[in-house]
């Protein structure tokens, strides 16, 4: 069916050259840079198509079969697919796929299971936790009496004895397990035992490792936690968004009410469509192979960096991310982040446990392998990337403001590498 109305027929290029130009520049950046930000990934063309669909037009307040608007028959179909697939992916009894983000998912759980002023125990941001787990600037740090556990100074591993001691002393309503920058596996059974000992609910935020869990390469928190939250991007390789899982029917009802109408109005149906596609992709054997490569690539990258004289927090990784301590090289995180970006490698400065530097400077960087693995990099390519990173490090030691010649040479090598593994 043709339509002469230019509102419906004009492309973005015809309608808005400025926005199209910015998008094309971002596409070129993604095509030509190696993405090592651990929380980022690259979605499939199918996910892009779903997220750019006519579902963006549809308001669908409520839940499938119980909407506050008409015309939701096919919105219901899409959301039901997303719910069924994510439940199957994580062997969960109940799922809410409407949270717009991981932060919204976490907020919904806290709204459902705790009252303002209640004590909440989460991992310290300084030790690798997330802002939404009770950091003072976040809503969770303002609404609740938020206490923080950390890691052992000797091992840099979560100090479960400290978690237990804080729980016994303060009797939190909610204990949060999860992280933003922690490279080791979590002991969900230990967390649940601690929660049960003080009558607390256990929430696991699996945002970073959801894909690893979906592939069966990490224990499934749904088997231990009262409630599990996650993002849909990162290792799960979907659109930017969130979801909540539980096996408890009463908690599920509270979560649904907390998401809508508690925190959100209408769901983003085009994003939920993208989530459904990504969940379907994650149910395949190809996805398990992908996650195995993500993990192997993290080991390969870490081995090269350690051999080159930098420290890895905890000595290595069990997952997709590496927390790099730059102090042996005499470098700072902000300095390295900027130099690597000039060289065609994107990462983020990141504090390390007990970091003496300010959060805007840091003594470390966080690296991740999901995006590079999605575009096809294997261990050989990640070893090459590690070698190039070390060259930038060494140049910075001589020229702390940046070595233009080294950065441009590395940039050319990175560009050539990316050309071998094109995206879109």
From Swiss-Prot:
Its cofactor is pyridoxal 5'-phosphate. Its EC number is 2.1.2.1. Its main location: cytoplasm. Pfam families: SHMT. InterPro entries: PyrdxlP-dep_Trfase, PyrdxlP-dep_Trfase_major, PyrdxlP-dep_Trfase_small, Ser_HO-MeTrfase, Ser_HO-MeTrfase-like, Ser_HO-MeTrfase_PLP_BS, SHMT-like_dom. The record marks 233 as: Plays an important role in substrate specificity. The modification N6-(pyridoxal phosphate)lysine is found at residue 234. GO terms for cellular component: cytosol. The keyword Repeat does not apply. It catalyses: (6R)-5,10-methylene-5,6,7,8-tetrahydrofolate + glycine + H2O = (6S)-5,6,7,8-tetrahydrofolate + L-serine. SUPFAM superfamilies: PLP-dependent transferases. Gene3D superfamilies: Aspartate Aminotransferase, domain 1, Type I PLP-dependent aspartate aminotransferase-like (Major domain). It comes from the Bacteria. (6S)-5,6,7,8-tetrahydrofolate binds at residues 125, 129-131, 250. Catalyzes the reversible interconversion of serine and glycine with tetrahydrofolate (THF) serving as the one-carbon carrier. This reaction serves as the major source of one-carbon groups required for the biosynthesis of purines, thymidylate, methionine, and other important biomolecules. Also exhibits THF-independent aldolase activity toward beta-hydroxyamino acids, producing glycine and aldehydes, via a retro-aldol mechanism. Homodimer. This is Serine hydroxymethyltransferase 2. It comes from Burkholderia pseudomallei (strain 1710b).
């Amino acid at each position: 069916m043709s339509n002469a109305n230019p509102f419906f027929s004009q492309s973005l290029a015809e309608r808005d050259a400025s926005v199209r130009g910015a998008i094309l520049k971002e596409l070129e950046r993604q095509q030509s840079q190696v993405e090592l930000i651990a929380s980022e990934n690259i979605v499939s063309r199918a996910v892009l198509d779903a997220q750019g669909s006519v579902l963006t037009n549809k308001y669908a307040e409520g839940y499938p079969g119980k909407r506050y608007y008409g015309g939701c028959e096919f919105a219901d179909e899409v959301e039901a697919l997303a719910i069924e697939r994510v439940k199957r992916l994580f062997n969960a009894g109940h799922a809410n796929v409407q949270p717009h983000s991981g932060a919204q998912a976490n907020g919904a759980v806290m709204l459902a299971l705790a009252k303002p002023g209640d004590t909440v125990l989460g991992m310290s941001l300084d030790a690798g936790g997330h802002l939404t787990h009770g950091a003072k600037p976040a809503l969770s740090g303002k609404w609740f009496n938020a206490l923080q556990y950390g890691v052992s100074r000797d091992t840099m591993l979560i100090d479960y004895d400290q978690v237990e001691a804080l729980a016994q002393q303060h009797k939190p309503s909610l204990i949060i397990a999860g992280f933003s920058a922690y490279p080791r596996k979590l002991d969900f059974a230990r967390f649940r035992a601690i929660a049960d000992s003080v009558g607390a609910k256990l929430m696991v935020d699996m945002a970073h490792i959801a894909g690893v869990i979906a592939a069966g390469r990490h224990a499934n928190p749904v088997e231990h936690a009262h409630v599990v939250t996650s993002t849909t991007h990162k290792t799960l390789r979907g659109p930017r968004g969130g979801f909540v899982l539980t096996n408890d029917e009463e908690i599920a009802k509270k979560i649904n009410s907390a998401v809508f109408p508690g925190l959100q109005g209408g769901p983003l149906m085009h994003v939920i469509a993208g989530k459904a596609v990504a969940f379907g992709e994650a149910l395949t054997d190809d996805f398990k192979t992908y996650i195995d490569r993500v993990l192997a690539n993290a080991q390969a990258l870490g081995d090269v960096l350690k051999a080159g004289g930098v420290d890895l927090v905890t000595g290595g990784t069990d997952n997709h991310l590496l927390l790099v301590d730059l102090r042996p090289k005499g470098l700072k995180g902000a300095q390295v982040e900027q130099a690597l970006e000039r060289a065609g490698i994107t990462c983020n400065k990141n504090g390390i446990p007990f970091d003496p530097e300010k959060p805007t400077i840091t003594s470390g960087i966080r690296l991740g392998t999901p995006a590079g693995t999605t575009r096809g990099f294997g261990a050989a390519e990640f070893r090459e990337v590690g070698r190039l990173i070390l060259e930038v490090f060494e140049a910075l030691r001589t020229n702390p403001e940046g070595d233009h010649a080294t950065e441009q040479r590395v940039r050319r090598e990175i560009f050539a590498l990316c050309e071998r593994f094109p995206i879109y």
